[in-house]
Amino acid sequence: MIPEKRIIRRIQSGGCAIHCQDCSISQLCIPFTLNEHELDQLDNIIERKKPIQKGQTLFKAGDELKSLYAIRSGTIKSYTITEQGDEQITGFHLAGDLVGFDAIGSGHHPSFAQALETSMVCEIPFETLDDLSGKMPNLRQQMMRLMSGEIKGDQDMILLLSKKNAEERLAAFIYNLSCRFAQRGFSPREFRLTMTRGDIGNYLGLTVETISRLLGRFQKSGMLAVKGKYITIENNDALAQLAGHTRNVA
């Protein structure tokens, strides 16, 4: 039986709200490891925002840190602007990811966050979340795990750019996307790229022409099937090996 206070809260927040207890990607997000009472406390501080349209920003570089954002659906890219005025993409965030961690140190966002497609996010006021985490060890531990994952991702990206050639970079990018889709319950073999080839090239330090040429080469070799933005992994072993992994795609 659903407690009365939870029913009231759901009615007040509108029919489009999905609460932590019901969210299909909660195991990737803050609610993971929290008990029902802790989930209720977390649920009370979260604001379910209306859809973020393609091209809209969650925050801009220099903005004060007020909230973290948990992605419920869609894709968000983070980027900075170089001294020369060029965009430099620093990450692609999928459902279950939290955006805004890099602002905790200074209290201001060092980067921009922009929707690549219509996306749904949960806004989590940081000061309230920080206060709650001081009272709830499980929440604090989960926050540490999520931040650790962010650091590991940054380290992997540094290794990717410093050690791998163009083929290996793109293979690693596609392999990583495949694994992330699998974690979210989607097909790891067939998926749509929500980012442009220009975005992928920017992120990997490659030109658009190089990305297109490599995708054609991967398709010709039988490793991938490429149709517009749709990717089908035809040879898991070859992709994993080129990406520097020995484990097959799940």
UniProtKB/Swiss-Prot annotation:
Cofactor mode of binding and number, as noted: Binds 1 [4Fe-4S] cluster per subunit.
Segments for region (Activating region 1A): 71-75
Keyword Iron assigned: yes
Chain residue ranges for the region called Activating region 1B: 116-121
Segments for region (Essential for the oxygen-regulated activity): 20-29
Segments of this protein annotated with the region Activating region 1C: 181-191
Keyword annotations from UniProtKB, A to Z: 4Fe-4S, Activator, Cytoplasm, DNA-binding, Iron, Iron-sulfur, Metal-binding, Repressor, Transcription, Transcription regulation
Gene Ontology molecular functions: 4 iron, 4 sulfur cluster binding; DNA binding; DNA-binding transcription factor activity; metal ion binding
Membrane-spanning segments: none
Region of interest: Activating region 2B: 123-124
UniProt-recorded name of the protein: Fumarate and nitrate reduction regulatory protein
Renumbered residue ranges of the record's region Activating region 2A: 47-50
Gene: fnr
Positions annotated to bind [4Fe-4S] cluster: C20, C23, C29, C122
Function: Global transcription factor that controls the expression of over 100 target genes in response to anoxia. It facilitates the adaptation to anaerobic growth conditions by regulating the expression of gene products that are involved in anaerobic energy metabolism. When the terminal electron acceptor, O(2), is no longer available, it represses the synthesis of enzymes involved in aerobic respiration and increases the synthesis of enzymes required for anaerobic respiration.
Region annotated Activating region 3D, chain positions: 112
Feature: DNA-binding region: 197-216
Organism field: Shigella dysenteriae
PROSITE patterns assigned to the protein according to its UniProt record, in alphabetical order: CNMP_BINDING_3 (PS50042), HTH_CRP_1 (PS00042), HTH_CRP_2 (PS51063)
Domain HTH crp-type: 164-237
